[in-house]
């Protein structure tokens, strides 16, 4: 999932609201890649036949709140934002088949290591290799951080001049070797990750999704939403943030974020009645919404015009 240090454009991990959100997320999901954290996010059921080729280690260390893979078709090119252990990518690889392609993007080295660990073995079982994992931030799908890491190993930053050269290199690869090219993706999926992005980066996140989608492309997102805007004192809690709670969008703001990024035809495919967490003693029940309620939502949207919102 999300986390860590080098940021395109300035080379430093940023602090917002007095909280280093990226460091909190990196640490939590880095640990969760090593040892299962059972209560992180909401477990869901998947098609068991699609899990047969996937090692238990990947399945056990998957942290999501929905199943966007249900909205994928054969032959499509799919981008998974915050691909984590790679479980969704390996499920989707079987749906799109040998003619399709799946790209997982994540910022967390331990998660990427886990996802890549079984690539060859799973491909051998399927008889084709159509999955790859790339390191980057989901709010900046132009900067390939594996390339940045490689550059830094050969050209460590030891002066202001070196830093300027790093910035120049990052600008160059963003244009000549983007992590994800413009209009190259049929479908974007993401599972309980958008909420982990820092507040000031969320607008860029939605703009990047729109940029990389082909015209007529689709988005299927499972994430956490709240019925009211999360209060500042909760947003400043790194444990709640990294647990997919205090970074949640308010429900209407979540939908509006897609609209503001020029998406159309927003369909609420599923809105869970059960709550993910109880915060500060607030009770959660059925479809009742109360201050601080956090629920799971699956949203599908299109990059072409159609009616505003719809429930499936």
Language-model regions, residue ranges each:
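Short, glycine-/aromatic-enriched active-site segment of Class I SAM-dependent methyltransferases
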Residues: 224-245
């Amino acid at each position: 999932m999300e986390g860590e240090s080098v940021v395109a454009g300035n080379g430093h991990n940023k602090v917002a609201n007095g909280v280093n959100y990226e460091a909190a997320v990196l640490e939590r999901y880095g640990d969760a890649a090593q040892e299962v954290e059972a209560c992180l996010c909401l477990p869901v059921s998947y098609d068991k036949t699609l899990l047969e080729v996937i090692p238990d280690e990947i399945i056990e260390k998957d942290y999501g709140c929905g199943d966007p893979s249900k909205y994928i078709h054969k032959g499509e090119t799919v981008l998974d934002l915050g691909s984590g252990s790679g479980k969704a990518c390996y499920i989707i690889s079987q749906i799109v088949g040998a003619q399709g392609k799946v790209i997982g993007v994540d910022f967390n080295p331990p998660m990427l290591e886990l996802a890549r660990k079984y690539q060859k073995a799973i491909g051998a079982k399927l008889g084709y290799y159509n999955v790859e994992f790339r390191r980057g931030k989901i709010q900046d799908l132009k900067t390939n951080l594996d390339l940045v890491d490689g550059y830094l190993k050969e050209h460590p930053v030891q002066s202001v001049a070196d830093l300027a050269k790093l910035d120049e290199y990052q600008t160059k690869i963003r244009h000549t070797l983007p992590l994800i090219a413009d209009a190259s993706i049929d479908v974007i999926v993401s599972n309980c990750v958008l909420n982990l992005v820092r507040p000031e980066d969320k607008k860029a996140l939605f703009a990047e999704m729109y940029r990389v989608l082909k015209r007529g492309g689709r988005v299927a997102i499972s994430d956490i939403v709240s019925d009211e805007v999360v209060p500042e004192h909760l947003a400043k809690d790194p444990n709640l943030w990294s647990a997919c709670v205090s970074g949640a969008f308010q429900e209407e703001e979540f939908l509006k974020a897609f609209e503001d990024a020029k998406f159309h035809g927003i369909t609420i495919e599923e809105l869970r009645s059960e709550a993910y967490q109880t915060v500060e003693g607030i009770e959660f029940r059925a479809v009742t919404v109360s201050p601080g309620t956090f629920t799971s939502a699956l949203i599908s949207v299109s990059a072409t015009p159609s009616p505003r919102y719809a429930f499936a």
